[in-house]
Amino acid sequence: MPRAVNALHFELDAGAETIGWDLLGLGLPASGEGYTRGRFEQRIEVIAPSGPAWLERGVLDFDDPRHAERTRRLLASPLGWDGRPVLGMLWFAAGAPLEERRRERLLESARAALPEALAGGATVPNRHVVVVRALADRVEPLAEGLGAVRAAWRREAWQLEATLPRVWRT
């Protein structure tokens, strides 16, 4: 059966900051083919000088009969993926704790930039990280929405223009 592992690991120095994102599209929604078999595991971790700052881990598993029904419910439930096949996460992480006012400004700018058409939200899991998670029916609208938040964060955090990474244009 198809298996995929997506593991991202970031170690940040005390003065370092980063913006990262991950988009996951399940199945082939344009062809009407949902995700109904295989196993996907994701692990995203950010390590600060003081230790682990953030760990995001998820598993979708149709291969193991013990987990297949739970995976099906998670993908269908309004408390889970709500039937949407695309999940996106965008995060701002810092090696040193962010001041409360700065965290609030990043949170506010994320909420203002995230299109209302996307099912998503922004949160601050701890003093090092601000996270946006969103669901969609297609990858493109989600990528555009998270791109708008990324642009807002670049302006807010670093007073930089919203230039796109070259790899996004290929």
Describe each model-derived feature in a short phrase:
Residues 1-36, 45:
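Internal, conserved structured core segments that host functional sites
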Residues 24-170:
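A structural signal for small-residue-enriched, beta-sheet-centric alpha/beta enzyme cores
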